[in-house]
From Swiss-Prot:
Record family assignment: Belongs to the AB hydrolase superfamily.
GO biological process: vitamin B6 catabolic process
Name of this chain's protein: 2-(acetamidomethylene)succinate hydrolase
pH dependence: Optimum pH is 7.0.
Organism: Mesorhizobium japonicum (strain LMG 29417 / CECT 9101 / MAFF 303099) (Mesorhizobium loti (strain MAFF 303099))
EC number(s) given by UniProt: 3.5.1.29
Length: 278
């Protein structure tokens, strides 16, 4: 089943939420306990719509454009882990729907674990997809280069799709289309990313900060998900993380690269539900 192909007829409520420190754009669907989704660097909330459709019969699913991304505010500074974590805490408090399950990919995983460690009273549990401590410098160098290369002018949506398909060769076409249609804005001469290039540069640098304290200190349940062929989280980084926290469950998704939730949405969905229902 192609989950990304099924979203056209499903209704999502999109709105901006003022949490006091910043205004964040969110997409919402469903009812029940609160489940928040946080995307990776340069991405936006739309990438989680296929998963939200499948989970919205049990949960109030809300995907967030994180600061500097999508249609959320883009301050000039403030792109460290604690800045993003404070946004998560502010959003949970503003929504006032009780403690939340956090599902994060990459940057979103880093931010979710940081928030859970810093604000345990606001978080029920975390699904951390393909971002751990101990990521090698070379992997972060490559990520930063990809991020900075994405700030360019595109002639039209087809040019965006072609660029994204080359950048993310394992992401299915329907998921590429979601990224293309949700992540770019018209400007003179074509289309540019909605994500702020200055914010992306600061965020990429911030991903190098030490994540060991957050993983060491977090007391809420955390599921670690890694793509088997991820070029960001190596098998060695995952092994060191498991030695740091042998109590945290791990799912390695066969055949998936870093973009686990888009490449393997069905396995991601099963991992989330098995973890929550355990």
């Amino acid at each position: 089943m192609d989950m990304a192909a099924d979203i056209a007829s499903d209704h999502f409520i999109s709105r901006r939420v003022d949490i006091g420190r910043i205004t964040l754009n969110v997409r919402e669907k469903g009812s029940g306990p609160l489940m928040l989704f946080f995307h990776g660097i340069t991405s936006n909330s739309a990438v989680f719509e296929p998963l939200m459709i499948r989970l919205s019969d049990r949960f109030t699913t809300i995907a967030v454009d994180q600061r500097g991304h999508g249609l959320s505010d883009k301050p000039e500074t403030g792109y460290e882990a604690n800045d993003y974590a404070d946004d998560i805490a502010g959003l949970i408090r503003t929504l006032a729907r009780g403690h939340a399950i956090l599902v994060g990919h990459s940057l979103g995983a880093r931010n979710s674990v940081t928030a859970a460690a810093k604000y345990p009273d606001l978080v029920r549990s975390v699904v951390a997809i393909d971002f751990t401590p101990y990521i090698e410098t070379e992997a972060l160098d490559a990520l930063e280069a990809r991020v900075n290369a994405g700030s360019q002018l595109f002639e039209d949506i087809k040019a965006v799709e072609a660029y994204l398909a080359g950048r993310y060769p394992n992401i299915p076409a329907d998921a590429i289309r979601i990224r293309a249609e949700s992540g770019y804005q018209p400007v003179d001469g074509g289309l540019r990313p909605l994500a702020s290039s200055a914010a992306m540069a600061q965020t990429a640098r911030g991903l190098r900060s030490d994540l060991v304290p957050a993983y060491r200190d977090v007391t809420k349940p955390v599921l670690i998900v890694r793509g088997e062929s991820s070029k960001l989280v190596s098998a060695a980084a995952l092994a060191k993380t498991s030695r740091l926290r042998p109590d945290l469950p791990v799912v390695v998704v066969p055949g998936a690269d870093h973009y686990v939730n888009e490449v393997s949405p069905e396995i991601t969905l099963k991992a989330i539900t098995n973890f929550i229902d355990a």
